[in-house]
Amino acid sequence: MKNAPLYEDILEGPLDGQARWLITADNVKIRAAYWNFSNSNGTIFVFPGRNEYIEKYGRTCKKIQSIGYSSIVIDWRGQGLSERLVKNKLIGHVNLFQDYQRDVNALVLFATKKRFPEPWFLFAHSMGGAIGLRAINNGLPIQKVIFSAPMW
């Protein structure tokens, strides 16, 4: 797992964040950012919506940290700085919606290896909510979840 960029100048979030490149089971490079601290009450996973990116959730992660939780956010394949599947890098294409589950699996594997504090919770917005619901149905070890609109 190599370091990935995290643009703190637009993040407006906690300053101690880190970003990593993760590789999914089908070899797609995705970006994840996290704020993990040892005396945390648990971890809140943040699943963004379509056309969103990690830095948009900086304020959210700052609030999460202020209430005593670690957080981890993902750029889905074809979104943010994650790898694009087509030549035109401005298009956020995915072959099958279920492919996003590979992104979830890579994120969970990373969080498990890094020993992110449990229990785990999920905040999922729009498309991230649809991805999150499927992941929960597939066994994502989440204790509680918040889904927000519009796609939800």
Label the predicted regions.
Residues 1-23, 28-36:
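An N-terminal hydrophobic leader/cap segment in hydrolases
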Residues 41, 47-52:
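Active-site glycine-rich loops that stabilize anionic/oxyanionic intermediates
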Residues 54, 61-87:
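Conserved alpha/beta-hydrolase
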Residues 92-112:
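Alpha/beta-hydrolase active-site loop
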Residues 115-126:
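Alpha/beta-hydrolase fold nucleophile elbow
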Residues 120-121, 144-146:
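Residue in the alpha/beta-hydrolase core beta-strand immediately N-terminal to the catalytic nucleophile
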Residues 129-140:
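Short glycine-enriched nucleophile-adjacent loop
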Residues 146-152:
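Active-site nucleophile loop of the alpha/beta-hydrolase fold
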